[in-house]
């Protein structure tokens, strides 16, 4: 254990003054790495909220570009090889986490992914520290072995589901009891995703970069290039729509899926949509991208666990057309803030696209107002963080409650 303690000391950056001055409980979040993504975003948002509450936030991961964000918030990062699924490494990570829990007097461990959850569970159980997990996806079972591997996410004192859809999946697939499940939707940063915070200059610069024709209605589908995100369905829908005056932008990198990208490009050519549909690998200013768009589409053919794009578009007051399944459908009030369409139905999507593009200005303005109000009432980062802090407080109260006399 001494060598593990030494490695933990070397893996941690020197804690900052804000961390050392905090007097509240210590929360250790555990995830594979700090690359860009929903899991990482949630961990960083929670670390900042924990510090703002006067508590102490620690994040253990293999590191990545978002580590700097943690440090700016005053949180402590512990570098561990938590992205590995190698059973031996997972076992050693349990010892590393146990040492970290002891050293920093951790009150709650919060695991956000499966392999790290195994390590976190072993460490937390050995030291009788409450464990929280967040179920970020459906984690397709694919057999008894995979099902058992996934089930670690339901073996916590509290299981956070990021949508009602995920909560029902956890109940049905893993038999997790209701009393341990808490539904906490992911939250949007409404300071960044605020129509009033995006200047005309930012929108104009993006339009020039994307070579959008003046006055052309813009349809955008954000999402990495993978088949289930439904880019092909949208291309087919645009072909059925038959309008040549619109611009369709697929925003997302192929992440090595070059064959799928080539397939999409061929589909565009086959439909004669070159000059209308384009693929943009990356967008560094998504708030401006939403403002540039007249319609935002989420055409996923498999259910989304939550639907971040739908919530962000709503926060920006953009009409959304969404596949009517999974967590994404929970974000849309059909016919009020956007529309639901049958998954993988290009004909139905084409009809909704035509309706959305042709919205009268007054109707569009009212839909925008309703969408913004709906997201701000239910899907903000602040609400997500406050609800998660409540889960922590609930577990701490149970831990500290006097036992029977």
Language-model segments: which ranges?
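Short His-centered aromatic/hydrophobic patch
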Residues: 111-117, 135
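A conserved mid-protein helix/loop that constitutes part of the nucleotide-sugar donor-binding site
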Residues: 37-45, 217, 221-240, 262, ...
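Glycosyltransferase donor-sugar binding loop
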Residues: 61-65, 188, 222, 247-263
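A short, well-ordered alpha-helix in the C-terminal region of glycosyltransferases
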Residues: 355, 362-378, 387-390
